[in-house]
Amino acid sequence: MKDQQTVIMTECTSLQFVSPFAFEAMQKVDVVCLASLSDPELRLLLPCLVRMALCAPADQSQSWAQDKKLILRLLSGVEAVNSIVALLSVDFHALEQDASKEQQLRHKLGGGSGESILVSQLQHGLTLEFEHSDSPRRLRLVLSELLAIMNKVSESNGEFFFKSSELFESPVYLEEAADVLCILQAELPSLLPIVDVAEALLHVRNGAWFLCLLVANVPDSFNEVCRGLIKNGERQDEESLGGRRRTDALRFLCKMNPSQALKVRGMVVEECHLPGLGVALTLDHTKNEACEDGVSDLVCFVSGLLLGTNAKVRTWFGTFIRNGQQRKRETSSSVLWQMRRQLLLELMGILPTVRSTRIVEEADVDMEPNVSVYSGLKEEHVVKASALLRLYCALMGIAGLKPTEEEAEQLLQLMTSRPPATPAGVRFVSLSFCMLLAFSTLVSTPEQEQLMVVWLSWMIKEEAYFESTSGVSASFGEMLLLVAMYFHSNQLSAIIDLVCSTLGMKIVIKPSSLSRMKTIFTQEIFTEQVVTAHAVRVPVTSNLSANITGFLPIHCIYQLLRSRSFTKHKVSIKDWIYRQLCETSTPLHPQLLPLIDVYINSILTPASKSNPEATNQPVTEQEILNIFQGVIGGDNIRLNQRFSITAQLLVLYYILSYEEALLANTKTLAAMQRKPKSYSSSLMDQIPIKFLIRQAQGLQQELGGLHSALLRLLATNYPHLCIVDDWICEEEITGTDALLRRMLLTNNAKNHSPKQLQEAFSAVPVNNTQVMQIIEHLTLLSASELIPYAEVLTSNMSQLLNSGVPRRILQTVNKLWMVLNTVMPRRLWVMTVNALQPSIKFVRQQKYTQNDLMIDPLIVLRCDQRVHRCPPLMDITLHMLNGYLLASKAYLSAHLKETEQDRPSQNNTIGLVGQTDAPEVTREELKNALLAAQDSAAVQILLEICLPTEEEKANGVNPDSLLRNVQSVITTSAPNKGMEEGEDNLLCNLREVQCLICCLLHQMYIADPNIAKLVHFQGYPCELLPLTVAGIPSMHICLDFIPELIAQPELEKQIFAIQLLSHLCIQYALPKSLSVARLAVNVMGTLLTVLTQAKRYAFFMPTLPSLVSFCRAFPPLYEDIMSLLIQIGQVCASDVATQTRDIDPIITRLQQIKEKPSGWSQICKDSSYKNGSRDTGSMDPDVQLCHCIERTVIEIINMSVSGI
């Protein structure tokens, strides 16, 4: 085997190959260049040149005719041309037929070497036969030999064999054999495909030489031949004789055509075959390019294979490296050895002053180690050094390369060299440090370990200088700190992730291999106290954003906060975190939110139970206010902002998260002597939360998860800022319409000042034009631009209540208020509530605060009574009421949690052993009861507002239901009737206010159905039932609790329940309504038997009209209701029988009406029955009740007869 390899290496050394110059001339058919070739070079190309000269060309141009003459002149003096001409004179058609017959014969004989049709029995050896034969026979000899080899190749199933052939081995006849081979392939391409011929030539001696000549005479076939050889090649070429021969042949081809060498290398990678060839071609290219300072092609190529995204290529090349190391022989002929040697030479070529660990020992005696021994890495070599380090990391970590002692020594020297303070230098130091962690086996001797410690100490000393000089925020100092923290907290897996991330590759690092490095870091270089003290002094990253990659101070601080190092060693970190939050920009860095969360945890949770006071300090209120300077009020809101919107949003996230965590940890904090305090309500009032949330909404892509986190905190702590109507209104304000309005924005709209607006309001209602013009212009401004006008708008709302103010002004003010509500709701609400207080002479108005309104939301409804009949301002009032009701719930829940910590101590003093949970339950129940009372009171007040005042009744406003009012307008036919009714129509102020109130009540009932139940158990004026049932869509939920309401012992509640049910049955004629109505009829029948005379009159007089509604909604109840009515009449008649006999005819009529309703239909239409002709005021209550029964029956009959 070894002899065969030696033969392969030396077989072609004495032969002359086609030069790159000659091949290029053949490719381009450059006759001038061909004429300049020497005779030996020209001899190799004769087959192609002779064919060009003799065969009829496809190109009939004059230029080719001249070139052809030059070729003929060139060939005229060459003796070998005659023999090639003779070869071309043979009958190739007959030759091809004989070859085909021989192929068929061999196929039948199973590939055996039987009688040949092409060549008769040979008298002598193949070489002598070739020498004595004429041209036709020479063609047959070579063709027969070639076909035999090709057949054997096809039958070998990929197993390589070496075929000994005199014809291809005799140095005397190589050129003649090559001529014959080229002519055969050119004239018989279908019989001898060039790729198959190339494959066959690999199996004979001098095959690479023959292959190069063949391709040189058919230069267009170069890529086809190379691709075919690579495709049929081995996955690992250095493992077999065939692979090495194939690699050598392709290498010779690429030397002949160097311009295509890299393309051939690309084919190698694409097919994942012949890795040695890819490396060999790269080595050849590297030697030719002579690149000293830049990264060599070899480094780029191998790095691309191992660090690329193609896992198949990575595995294929890694196998090549591993297999190469497993072979015991590692001679200079090995491609892997050549590659390693070349890489080592490149590494040594960029090293600073050559030094070793021995020099360190000598230097320690007489000089400082950083004077001359540790000379720096040249700036032009830094990038190349980084690339080499990454390549060696990939070779060792991915491909499993085991470095030799020399390689390890030189690598350690390079890693511990000192680069200049440039961004590339920072990158190089980070890579070197991570490589030391990943491959600690490179440090094997005490001297090398000392060298590493000295270098790490230099890193710590020079870190600040590097950061200031290079201008790179992500310096290696942060990485040192981070690794030290990970070692102290024994987070070895985190170190491994950090190393892999920095190196940019996933390599296997055993945690046990880091044990020595851990000892060095934690005991010699970075103690935990040193790490903590140093971290605070690290400058914050300026304009920190996600665009700044790498390991930053924020990563170190985050890990130290997680491990509670700051509190453990009593180091204040609050100022650093505050400064870093101020120095932020978009896109948001992903480490900022986790940093805030862990910082809040360190404020509220002690580091250890033994030291409960070991916590960090929270950010002060003044520092928070400084962040929002320019956003808190002021006319120039856009000009005064010192800090970015990112910083403001992060501080808002900190405050909301802090308050939430404070409430969640009240029981834990109760044990602390120095308890963290909640931020004051005055501070929260000054922060424009809604404005900031709106800003965040437009920056969702750049803020990552911050916007969604803020929405979650807002929904939990400030539900009144998350009202659905507000979001819908916001969509309208920020949508397409807003863009169109901005296009209409004129300079006049921008020039109106708040002072001008105040002067215009002062002229109302005498002069409405000016204020109308200004506020119409203001509608074109954005929400943030309207903020300076908020105080003027709200303070003048009370003037708008005076008579004579146009509705358009009111509606425009309402529109502006809603726009302002999207950016400053809390401040706006407080100003509006104070502005709408009733003006009482000689009584000083109280100025309410945000806290007052959250404690008692009903203050909102203690406004000027004129607001109740001003729909645009009532809409604003209802909006505020809804918000403050929600805010009150959140406030009380937070207050309950805040004061929870005081309860256990009180329980202990009382001595309620084993009942410590009872007070909490009671407090929760009391809170819920308070909230329910608050909500129900608000509903009752709103319902009372829906009732017409005495003045409105005097003016003829109809207090009837919304449903009946709508029907009356629809059915009115007289054109002048609407004029007579005045404002009693769908557009009157009372009707509009009723609609607004019904909408709010609907929302409240849907949000909490218990409110509806509580309100209806309390009851309200029955005149409002038509309005509430028709105007509140969610009133159908009352059907669930009406049976319970009817079962109440109070007669008033029973009456209210039946009246409510009668309206619900008309509005919702559902099976459920029918069952409840049937229950009500049965209850009425039961009560008839138990009620006294007075209570009977009080109960049935208001409820009997409800029976008509039951029948109208559900005709099947007709029989039961008629029986009930007659039963009531009989009971009443029996009570008055002894006093008067007038009642008997009524009972008789009732019986007749029930039995023959059709006969009484005309009588029922008589006005005396409908209106009642008798004086009921002086009648007995039972008599009055009987007459009421009669009217009810007649109404039911009229309804049934008319088909209604």
UniProtKB/Swiss-Prot annotation:
Organism (species): Homo sapiens (Human)
GO cellular component, one term: cytoplasm
Biological processes annotated in GO: regulation of transcription elongation by RNA polymerase II; RNA polymerase II transcription initiation surveillance; snRNA 3'-end processing; snRNA processing
Transmembrane segments: 428-444
Keyword Transmembrane: yes
Protein name stated in the entry: Integrator complex subunit 2
Keywords recorded for this protein, A-Z: Cytoplasm, Membrane, Nucleus, Transmembrane, Transmembrane helix
UniProt-annotated location(s): Nucleus; Nucleus membrane; Cytoplasm
Role: Component of the integrator complex, a multiprotein complex that terminates RNA polymerase II (Pol II) transcription in the promoter-proximal region of genes.
Keyword Nucleus: yes
InterPro entries in the cross-refs: Int2_metazoa, INTS2
Family named by the database record: Belongs to the Integrator subunit 2 family.
Annotated PANTHER family: INTEGRATOR COMPLEX SUBUNIT 2
Topology with respect to the bilayer: Single-pass membrane protein
Subunit description: Component of the Integrator complex, composed of core subunits INTS1, INTS2, INTS3, INTS4, INTS5, INTS6, INTS7, INTS8, INTS9/RC74, INTS10, INTS11/CPSF3L, INTS12, INTS13, INTS14 and INTS15. The core complex associates with protein phosphatase 2A subunits PPP2CA and PPP2R1A, to form the Integrator-PP2A (INTAC) complex.
